[in-house]
């Protein structure tokens, strides 16, 4: 059972914003479809005064569809063009006859400025909790829904910063054959084409907007503007790695022609080479690419994400999610080299099964996959069977983290070892960061200052297979869950940090929890950051094993330095039948593996 007060607050927050209310009516103001209807939307030739029942009588905008509650067998056919209104879908199909939203081949451009907005509270993303976030497609309490396009031919494009698809309290939703991109990416980029003396010449990829004034360059676009500098990476396409540096503060920039610039160094020599790309963004996490909240049975199949803003696909308190044949990478013939500000696939407090198979992940500034829960600090015990807990990280708070019936573990902040359990019987949201939990049983007597709790009801199993991870300056997979984890037959290419990282902490990101059953099998690791597999919980005063029952078998490591596996504070570890090489020569296991 979900916390009704927190759920209501979430829904009210999602309805907050400047979008015209007539375009996004409440459920009680909508008309119930009888089912098995086909409607058409044509932004170029349609008219919202039409019946919408045929291509020749299509609606012009999403507004008429937003006045319906869809039913089994309904199909909404959306023709390409410019969409000034978001699709705000309510309805319920059946498994045999789902509600189908069919985006026809072509470019579907969602315009900036008039889209539906809300204030969802998003894990690891909440730098701007009160800033409305635009949404192109929103599924609200929808069930048995199919979003579909033609692979390689149907593109959903954002003109400005927005969430592509936001779903909350949805069930049995699939996304099939869709491409997602920005007309004007919020990641600034340029490609160095020539270096001569103290000057570099560079090309800015199509679609990335900028201005040059007084020797400085400013990136801008609908909903986003910042001066070149700050957080940046240099990507070397020849090696597929991030290397080099560039400081625009020591340069004078001139525009030679549209999309062409020169960069003259006031001191020193050019620090980049022809073929290298400069990637630049601000660090304010104010949005994400996709947001899936309190939803279950979600399938992504044969989709391509070319670019998304902020944290990537965020699944928060969702159940049973599968990504199959998903590719996250720029368009093949584009000069762009980045597809995501932060993580590709981010899972916070999920349960059921997370399956990632046959995917290509990367081209981001952070991890390809991150699976974790959240540690909340115990700050008060107002009654023997009550505790007050607090979200501690400034980018993670405000969401419904507990419900009656959820089981919690009490965890030592020093050792990260759980020492007691309890069950939630009541939840009271005190403010955006503090929650009072009523528990079925009294609190243990040995709670120490700064100890934390984890919602262990919401912990998923994870199976990642046949997936490529590349063009990432950080980690490949971050995995902390007590349910079974299997990573098999994946390929990790030159990640800047460990390819697989298992941590758990109660002092930094507060990302939980313990690992109890993990197998890493038959994967290939090529020149990744070391240790390539690192299992090191952040326990300030370790006492006993935090993680246990981990098997690393049958993997192939091509090493840069020599450390393939580093493990601490973990019991029941098996590292066997792995192959280690460096510079083409085999390395014995005892030199490549460090377990203590």
Label for each model-derived stretch:
Residues 182-183, 207-256, 397-432:
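Ser/Thr/Gly-rich low-complexity blocks that favor extended beta-strand/coil architectures
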Residues 37, 74, 85, 97-99, ...:
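The right-handed parallel beta-helix/beta-solenoid scaffold, focusing on the short coil/turn
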Residues 68, 84-102, 108-146, 157-176, ...:
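Extracellular beta-strand-rich solenoid/capping regions of secreted or surface-exposed proteins
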Residues 85-88, 112, 158-164, 184-189, ...:
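Short glycine/acidic-rich loop motifs that flank beta-strands on beta-rich extracellular proteins
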Residues 237-285, 418-421, 425-463, 470:
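Small/polar beta-strand repeat architecture
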Residues 7-17:
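Bacterial N-terminal signal peptides
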Residues 26, 43-102, 135-136:
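Acidic Gly/Asp/Thr-rich repetitive segments characteristic of extracellular carbohydrate-active
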């Amino acid at each position: 059972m979900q916390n009704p007060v927190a759920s209501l607050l979430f829904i009210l927050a999602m309805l907050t914003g400047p979008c015209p209310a007539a375009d996004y009516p409440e459920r009680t103001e909508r008309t119930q479809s009888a089912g098995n209807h086909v409607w058409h939307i044509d932004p170029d030739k349609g008219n919202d005064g039409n019946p919408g029942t045929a291509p020749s009588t299509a609606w012009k905008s999403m507004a008429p569809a937003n006045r319906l509650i869809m039913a089994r067998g309904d199909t909404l056919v959306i023709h390409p063009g410019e969409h000034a209104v978001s699709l705000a879908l309510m309805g319920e199909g059946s498994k045999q006859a789902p509600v189908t939203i069919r985006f026809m081949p072509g470019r579907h451009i969602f315009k900036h400025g008039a889209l539906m907005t809300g204030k969802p509270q998003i894990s690891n993303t909440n730098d701007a909790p009160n800033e409305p976030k635009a949404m192109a497609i929103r599924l609200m309490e929808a069930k048995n829904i199919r979003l579909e396009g033609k692979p390689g031919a149907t593109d959903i494009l954002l003109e400005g910063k927005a969430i592509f698809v936001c779903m909350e309290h949805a069930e049995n939703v699939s996304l099939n054959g869709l491409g997602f991109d920005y007309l004007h990416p919020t990641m600034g980029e340029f490609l160095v084409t020539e270096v001569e003396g103290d000057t570099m010449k560079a090309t800015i990829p199509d679609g990335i907007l900028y201005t040059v004034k007084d020797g400085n360059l400013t990136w801008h676009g609908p909903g986003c503007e910042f001066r070149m500098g700050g957080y940046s990476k240099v990507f070397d396409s020849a090696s597929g790695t991030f290397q080099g540096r560039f400081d625009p503060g020591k340069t004078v920039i001139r525009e030679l022609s549209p999309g062409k610039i020169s960069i003259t160094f006031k001191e020193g020599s050019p620090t980049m080479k022809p073929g290298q790309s400069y990637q630049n963004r601000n660090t304010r996490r104010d949005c994400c690419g996709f947001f899936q909240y309190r939803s279950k049975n979600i399938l992504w199949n044969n989709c391509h994400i070319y670019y998304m803003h902020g944290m990537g696909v965020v699944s928060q308190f969702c159940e049973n999610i599968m990504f199959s044949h998903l590719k996250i990478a720029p368009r093949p013939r584009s000069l762009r080299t980045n597809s995501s500000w932060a993580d590709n696939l981010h899972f916070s407090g999920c349960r059921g099964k997370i399956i990632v198979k046959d995917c290509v992940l990367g081209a981001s500034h952070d991890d390809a996959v991150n699976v974790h829960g959240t540690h909340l600090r115990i700050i008060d015990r107002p009654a023997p069977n009550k505790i007050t807990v607090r979200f501690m990280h400034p980018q993670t708070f405000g969401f419904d983290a507990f419900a009656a019936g959820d089981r919690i573990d009490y965890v030592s902040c020093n050792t990260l070892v759980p020492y007691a359990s309890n069950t939630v019987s009541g939840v009271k949201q005190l403010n955006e960061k503090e929650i009072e939990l009523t528990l079925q049983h009294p609190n243990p007597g040995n709670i120490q200052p700064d100890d934390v709790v984890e919602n262990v009801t919401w912990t998923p199993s994870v199976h990642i297979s046949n997936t490529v991870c590349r063009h990432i300056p950080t980690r490949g997979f971050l995995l902390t869950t007590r349910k079974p984890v299997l990573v098999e037959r994946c390929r990790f290419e030159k990640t800047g940090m460990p390819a697989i990282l298992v941590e758990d902490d109660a002092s930094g990101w507060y990302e939980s929890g313990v690992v109890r059953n993990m197998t890493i099998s038959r994967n290939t690791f090529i020149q990744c950051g070391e240790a390539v597999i690192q299992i090191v919980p952040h326990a300030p005063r370790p006492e006993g094993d935090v993680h246990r029952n981990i098997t690393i078998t049958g993997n192939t490591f091509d090493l840069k330095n020599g450390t393939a596996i580093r493990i601490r504070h973990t019991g029941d570890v098996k590292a066997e039948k792995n192959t280690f090489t460096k510079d083409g020569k085999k390395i014995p296991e005892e030199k490549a593996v460090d377990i203590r």
